[in-house]
Amino acid sequence: AEQGYAIELDIQITKDGRIVVFHDDTMKRMCGNEGKISDYTYEELQQFHLGDSTEKIPLLREVLQTVDGRVPLLIEIKMPGLSTAVCAGFQKEMEGYTGMFCMESFNSLALRWCRRHMPQTLRGQLSGRFSKDDKVHLILRIMARHLMLNFIGKPDFIAYDHRYADCPGFLIDRMLFRTPAFAWTVKDEHVYNRTRKKFDAAIFEH
């Protein structure tokens, strides 16, 4: 935040409907225990620490209070299924927040929900190459990779895995619709310079 760059973060919903900031699909890597965020209530999550630190999984509202509009936020909504409860929770948490923010998701249904209920919020479609481990039907994986589900979410921008920027679907979208595109995740200057030819901006690690 001190450098003025936007912050990308991921949100998930707990078993009792609280919206927390947490990246991974499971808690194994960061907390050392099995299960997903949605398997626990927020109170139960407070027994776990992040890595070797004393920090705990924060609520979205706590992060919003810390950032306090100093830099823009790019908020990824983790929505693995059909339930839009996390979207409704996101809307509630963002009410009254005066800082700049936009949302993104791999799930086109999350974009559609936000388009209907938060029409002033910019929406981004995340995509890239999907594997069998993603537990998504083959046809849906192909359609998502080639951005063939954009008619559902009608994204304002694309956030695409830069390693697969030669994907026909991505190239066609760029040529025909000229949808602004973010490259993810850029980890060094060499990759950044290479992605500048095909993308408008980058989501990077520091």
PLM regions and their residue ranges:
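Metal-dependent phosphodiesterase/phospholipase catalytic core, i.e.
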Residues: 23-131, 151-155, 159-163
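The start of beta-strands in P-loop NTPase/AAA+ ATPase cores
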Residues: 3-5, 18-19, 71, 102
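Paired acidic/hydrophobic, glycine-rich loop segments that form the ligand-binding mouth/hinge
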Residues: 6, 122-124, 201-203
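Glycine-rich, proline-tolerant flexible connector loops at the mouths of alpha/beta enzymes
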Residues: 13-26
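Active-site flanking residues adjacent to catalytic metal/cofactor-binding acidic residues
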Residues: 7-9, 22-23, 75-77, 204
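C-terminal active-site rim and adjoining tail of enzyme catalytic domains
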Residues: 133-206
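Catalytic domains of carbohydrate-active enzymes, especially glycoside hydrolases
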Residues: 1-13, 152-157
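Short alpha-helical
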Residues: 14-15, 81, 109, 165, ...
